Amino acid sequence: MKTTIKQAKQHLNQEVTIGAWLTNKRSSGKIAFLQLRDGSGFMQGVVVKSEVSDETFQLAKEITQESSLYVTGVITEDNRSDLGYEMQVKSIEVIHEAHDYPITPKNHGTEFLMDHRHLWLRSKKQHAVMKIRNEIIRATYEFFNENGFTKIDPPILTASAPEGTSELFHTKYFDEDAFLSQSGQLYMEAAAMAHGRVFSFGPTFRAEKSKTRRHLIEFWMIEPEMAFTNHVESLEVQEQYVSHVVKSVLKNCQLELKALDRDTSKLEKVSAPFPRISYDDAIKFLKEEGFNDIEWGEDFGAPHETAIANHYDLPVFITNYPTKIKPFYMQPNPENEETVLCADLIAPEGYGEIIGGSERINDLELLEQRIDEHQLDAESYNYYLDLRRYGSVPHSGFGLGLERTVAWISGVEHVRETAPFPRLLNRLYP
């Protein structure tokens, strides 16, 4: 009977066959231990010399790392294993013998591992990170589907920039100029006027020449937009969504979190509602903490965000930033016209901003004024202005960066480990 490592527990004390790769092995004179993986998980295969043919035992001692195999044996309980079971191997068939696998069990430098990313993905820790990424995506669809959102796919080739910045990848669209999308937000706002509550999930591209542990050139975003929704209501959706994702990972990725040595005590405290601090109060807090390198009207850097998040030891919303440091489309704060109704959600443990969101301007005249102030091409935004001409309503939205969220929940140091094939400054291979 053929099965997988993940499903093998259903076949305790039965003989099964598993297709797998050999990740590592050790042996003595009378017993060999094979570390097997098949994509669904990792399992130990035990080969006892007295219980198999001489040929099988010799093969078990000689198999090379990453050779592909069919391994047949009996699944037995093993309380020492993370899985709770292992295989008592009876026979081994080599599908393909690997030679000189470059990523050996010893430590390797980051550049070497990134050059061999297509192979590094096979390691237990990288496998765990990708499984957690997959669970976050699954939980995302679950949350938005259960809360009445419609999935919409905005274009990746665009004629304008939602953020109104110069950090764009330029290309030609036949005889026209086009750009790789920085965000699907403006299109999602249009979709929200048709469907009420919408979300997108797709790649975005930013030509930022940044080498920090938080930045990728290509990354994936979840971007919901909600009609008839104000800023406070949007914050409630955001914290419910993030709480749902964290709880889903804690429930469904216990083996992966253990493989990463992730301290889950902080994740277990993540539950809506999240603390909130205004930009004004955040500046005061930082001054009191001895930060003299920031003044009102300036954006926060990584050390500032980390200090604020560490104070709460939870995800925290920083609200109502100054108008001049935020994009053109954000609704003014009626209590202070120098600020806007927006928030960034800062993850604890130094992982920084994972969500940016705001209430959107719904008044045509004000939006036209903002486009002019930001010296943007009004004609490129004509479709966006139409949303304010025909049945405009209060509406809000946000964007969550998938890779930063994966980094935070999995506890990895750098976002390069959270994308299967990361695109970084000066790295386009593999």
UniProtKB/Swiss-Prot annotation:
The keyword Methyltransferase does not apply. Its EC number is 6.1.1.22. The keyword Ribosomal protein does not apply. It is an enzyme of class 6 (ligase). One of its GO terms (cellular component) is cytoplasm. Keywords: Aminoacyl-tRNA synthetase, ATP-binding, Cytoplasm, Ligase, Nucleotide-binding, Protein biosynthesis. One of its GO terms (biological process) is asparaginyl-tRNA aminoacylation. It catalyses: tRNA(Asn) + L-asparagine + ATP = L-asparaginyl-tRNA(Asn) + AMP + diphosphate + H(+). It comes from the Bacteria. GO terms for molecular function: asparagine-tRNA ligase activity; ATP binding; catalytic activity, acting on a protein; nucleic acid binding; transferase activity. InterPro entries: Aa-tRNA-synt_II, aa-tRNA-synth_II, aa-tRNA-synth_II/BPL/LPL, Asn-tRNA-ligase, Asp/Asn-tRNA-synth_IIb, NA-bd_OB-fold, NA-bd_OB_tRNA. It is found in: Cytoplasm. NCBIfam families: asnS, PRK03932.1, PRK05159.1. Belongs to the class-II aminoacyl-tRNA synthetase family. Homodimer. HAMAP family: Asn_tRNA_synth. This is Asparagine--tRNA ligase. It comes from Staphylococcus haemolyticus (strain JCSC1435). The gene is asnS.
